[in-house]
Every structure is written in C-alpha cells, then in structure tokens.
C-alpha cells in the first residue's frame, strides 16, 4: 500500500537527484520505488530485525542498507541529494530528539537537496495503533518553524486523510541555531 498510494503523494513533482537517503526504511516498503527514481539508495534502519528483512528483500548493488540512528548519522556533510523519512519522526521519544534528527537531515543533505517526509496526525486511532511503542506526533502547525530553525527553506506542509507530508529544501545558509551559537561565541 505504501508504494501505491503514499509514495506518489510524497515524491511526485520533486527532483530527488542521484542519491537518496531513506531513514527508517523498515522492511523496505518504499525502497524499491525509490530505486526506480534514483541511481543510488542508502537505507538507514534502527531496528536490527527490520534491517535483516530489508537486506533479504532488497539485495541490489545500488542499495546500501545500514543500521543507524537518525539523531546521529554516520555520513559526511552533504552526502545525499535528498532524504526521505516516512512515518519516522513520531517514533522518537522527545521533541529534542526529533529536532536533532531534523538537524542531522539538514547536515547530510547537499545544498539545494530535498527533505521529504510523511507523518500521521494525532488522534485516538493512531495512539491506539502505537500503544506498545513510542508515539510522539509531530504537530503540523509547528513543523514549518522547526524546519526553518534547522535551516530549511521552501517548507510546505500538506494534509491528506489523517496524515501530512513535509517538503523542505536545504538552503545554502547556516541554520538559525548555528547563527545563534556563533553570535553567542563571538560575544563571549
């Protein structure tokens, strides 16, 4: 279902470039579709069981699958032309961890690169579905400001059937939190 209904809504009309980082790849529901659109996919998955299934399902020379954490990624600055995170941020245990993941996404993107995400809205059904796991929904009203604070420009938030997509582009400017740190260091 993910590749048939959700991915076109998230990805269509956005140039992904040549190398996509897929965060929270899970068992690979979106990985194959991403590979149809770009020449290289790097999939990052925190759960070792899901990573094992991902590797078994998608063993291709153009896919690299790694175990890792979105809040501290093992990649050089500017490594990816785009980053895709489908149903990832609400699994992080605090707003601070969500913001750290957003900052990491900004860091690993090339200038001009796109960040594309989908999240689910807060509500009793989504809470019930996550009763055994972390569910800290991203507030779509604050997403715009949080992405801008990380340095992203051209941010859009669009709603559809109990979910929303985020689209943002990495600017060439230093993130707002970096400017604030630099200013406080200069006055110290």
Segments the model singles out, each with a brief description of its role:
Residues 1-18:
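Conserved alpha-helix/loop element of class I SAM-dependent methyltransferases that forms part
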Residues 21, 26-72:
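Class I SAM-dependent methyltransferase SAM/SAH-binding core
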Residues 19, 112-114:
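Short glycine-centered segments of the SAM/dcSAM-binding site in methyltransferase folds
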Residues 84-85:
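A conserved beta-strand element that flanks and buttresses the S-adenosyl-L-methionine
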Residues 114-167:
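C-terminal alpha-helical "lid/dimerization" subdomain adjacent to the S-adenosyl-L-methionine
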Residues 167-188:
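C-terminal lobe and adjacent flexible extensions of AdoMet/dcAdoMet transferase-like proteins
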Residues 99-111:
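A short glycine-rich, Lys/Arg-flanked "PGG" loop and its adjoining helix->strand segment in the class I
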Residues 90-94:
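A short His-aromatic
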């Amino acid at each position: 279902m993910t590749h048939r209904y959700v991915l076109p809504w998230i990805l269509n009309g956005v140039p992904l470039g040549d190398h996509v980082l897929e965060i929270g790849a899970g068992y690979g529901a979106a990985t194959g579709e991403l590979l149809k659109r770009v020449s290289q996919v790097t999939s990052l998955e925190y759960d070792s069981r899901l990573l094992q299934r991902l590797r078994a399902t998608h063993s291709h020379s153009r896919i690299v699958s790694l175990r890792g954490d979105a809040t501290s990624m093992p990649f050089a600055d500017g490594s990816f032309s785009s980053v895709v995170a489908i149903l990832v941020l609400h699994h992080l245990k605090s707003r601070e961890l969500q913001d750290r993941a957003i900052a990491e996404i900004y860091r690993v993107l090339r200038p001009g690169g796109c960040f594309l995400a989908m999240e689910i809205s807060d509500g009793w059904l989504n809470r019930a579905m996550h009763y055994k796991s972390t569910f800290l929904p991203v507030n779509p009203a604050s997403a715009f400001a949080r992405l801008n604070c990380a340095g992203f420009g051209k941010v859009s938030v669009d709603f559809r059937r109990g979910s929303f997509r985020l689209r943002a582009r990495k600017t060439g400017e230093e993130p707002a939190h970096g400017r604030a740190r630099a200013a406080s260091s200069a006055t110290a």
